[in-house]
Swiss-Prot record:
Xref: PANTHER family: BB IN A BOXCAR, ISOFORM C, ETHANOLAMINEPHOSPHOTRANSFERASE
Topology with respect to the bilayer: Multi-pass membrane protein
InterPro entries found in the cross-reference section: CDP-OH_P_trans, CDP-OH_PTrfase_TM_dom, CDP_ALCOHOL_P_TRANSF_CS, CHOPT
Record-annotated membrane-spanning stretches: 48-68, 78-98, 136-156, 171-191, 213-233, 253-273, 285-305, 316-336, 344-364
Coiled coil segments of this chain: none
Provenance organism: Schizosaccharomyces pombe (strain 972 / ATCC 24843)
Name of the protein in question: Uncharacterized CDP-alcohol phosphatidyltransferase class-I family protein C22A12.10
Length: 386
């Protein structure tokens, strides 16, 4: 992705705006932990490096999961693994929370920080979804649905930020309360074991008609449904905020909503392919999951770039085209039926290449425009004058 001169010039007009209504971060996390952690961070450490180190903790979590699941072929992991997941996610959230403060106190705030932060958050969202799926041992359909819903919330929030110009965090948001809940999920599993979430419990007789169609429940299903409900409320709030901003600026609501269409087109293809080739999804779930993760990360990145450069909204994502082609083929000619494995491995490779190229080019252009480094703070930073 190449940024033209006008887009680069518009970068200098960008001003970060956020509204955080989280009581947890305002009264507990920020004063008693995040502010204290910031004091021990060297002034020489670049904000983006802090963000990247935070992601590194989660990458370690992913590696432990992959080793135990695919090398040792275990579904239930040792307690220390779950404990390390909780610690890793807690550190990720902490580092992600202070990178902006580090940028302000070192005078290195720039649109690159916004792009870098959102890009890392997009990758982390997929990582945490994968860990949660493994912990709760969800079936294939529930696993796909969980990734769809979790990434939808993030995408809608990014779409909302584009139209409102403000990052809005509700009283119960994913980056704060949602992550804290997942940390608690990992920590409790380390103590109780994963069977704690999977054990069947009889529905109380006092629940009346609910007991007639739900005689048993699990703690895992209760947590899953609660988080789904909270996610739905946040999605609806983001839709409301964005559409109000569009109407206030005399924009087209239909045009604004069409910005969400590519996301739903992609996932319609995913679900239709799962219905057609369930065995393939069972054997290659990790491939499909990573594919969706990279497409999502690219989509979010392009939207953020459009936002900070005051560019038109990107209504189309070329990376979803192979998904659509495969879905149409599955229900018509069936040409790709016998080469699904090769097709998707090539597809993943293309997505990684496109996303990597996008990240490298955008970072290079923004750092050159501002005369800065991405992961270091120069001793004498120089700003390029227009």
């Amino acid at each position: 992705m190449q940024l033209n001169r006008k887009q680069l010039k518009n970068l200098h007009n960008y001003k970060y705006s956020a509204i955080d209504n989280s009581l947890l971060s305002k009264y507990i996390l920020k004063p008693y932990w995040w502010n204290q952690l910031l004091k021990v961070i060297p002034m020489s450490m670049a904000p983006n490096l802090i963000t990247l180190i935070g992601l590194g903790f989660v990458v370690i979590n992913i590696l432990t999961m992959l080793v135990y699941k695919y090398h040792y072929e275990m579904d239930a992991f040792p307690s220390w693994v779950y404990a390390s997941w909780a610690i890793g996610l807690f550190l990720y959230q902490s580092f992600d929370a202070i990178d902006g403060s580090q940028a302000r106190r070192t005078g290195t705030s720039s649109p690159l920080g916004q792009l870098f932060d959102h890009g890392v958050d997009a990758i982390n969202t997929s990582f945490e979804v994968l860990l949660t799926i493994e912990l709760l041992q969800l079936d294939m359909f529930s696993s796909i649905l969980t990734q769809f819903a979790s990434l939808l919330y993030f995408y809608i929030s990014t779409w909302e930020e584009y139209h409102t110009g403000t990052l809005y965090l509700s009283y119960f948001s994913g980056p704060v309360e949602g992550i804290v809940m997942v940390i608690g999920l990992f920590a409790l599993t380390a103590i109780k074991g994963d069977s704690f979430w999977l054990k069947l419990h009889p529905t109380p007789e006092s629940w009346g008609f609910v007991r007639s169609f739900l005689p048993y429940y699990t703690y895992g299903s209760c947590l899953y449904n609660f988080m789904a409900f909270a996610l739905l409320l946040n999605v609806l709030q983001s839709l409301r905020n964005a559409l109000q901003a569009v109407q206030k600026n005399n924009g087209s609501v239909i045009k604004a909503l069409s910005g969400i269409l590519p996301y739903f087109l992609q996932w319609m293809a995913v679900f239709s392919l799962y219905a057609k080739y369930p065995a393939f999804f069972e054997h290659h779930f990790l491939t499909i999951f990573c594919l969706n993760a990279f497409i999502f990360a690219y989509s979010v990145g392009v939207v953020i770039v459009s936002h900070i450069t005051e560019s038109p909204f990107p209504y189309w994502n070329v990376l979803i085209l192979p998904f659509l082609v495969d879905a149409v083929d599955a229900y018509t000619f069936g040409v790709l039926k016998n080469v699904q494995t090769e097709y998707f491995f090539c597809y993943v490779g293309i997505c990684i290449g496109v996303y990597g190229n996008f990240v490298a080019h955008v970072i290079a252009m923004i750092t050159e425009e501002y005369g800065i480094k991405c992961l270091t703070i120069p001793s004498k930073p120089e700003s390029k004058k227009n």
